[in-house]
């Protein structure tokens, strides 16, 4: 999402207003590792579900109703409800203590027409690892694409 000019405080206030309803929904649907972060006026959200989880039409309608309460503060830069595309991964050591994991986020905007080349190059890096687990501190690293970012 991209915040509309001058709407950052409105977005934060409205998100706070729907937060109890949103977190209750996430708990009910067994959504975990939910996070929201921003880079300037861009807002990204992330969550995980069990592998074969799909939201029912009723649940999708609930999501749309919650979104409608804050939608006047942003425009979509990706397709609502569509998963981000995994561009690269190095999922390595599963850490018992999640507090030790470094959480970092960076963002870049791909030049038009470069997404497939970017993906192909990173697929080559994944193939070169030949399935070996990286024990280093930066394992469990992934790159996702949402709306060209």
Positions of predicted regions on the chain:
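Short amphipathic alpha-helical segments
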Residues: 7-29, 114-137
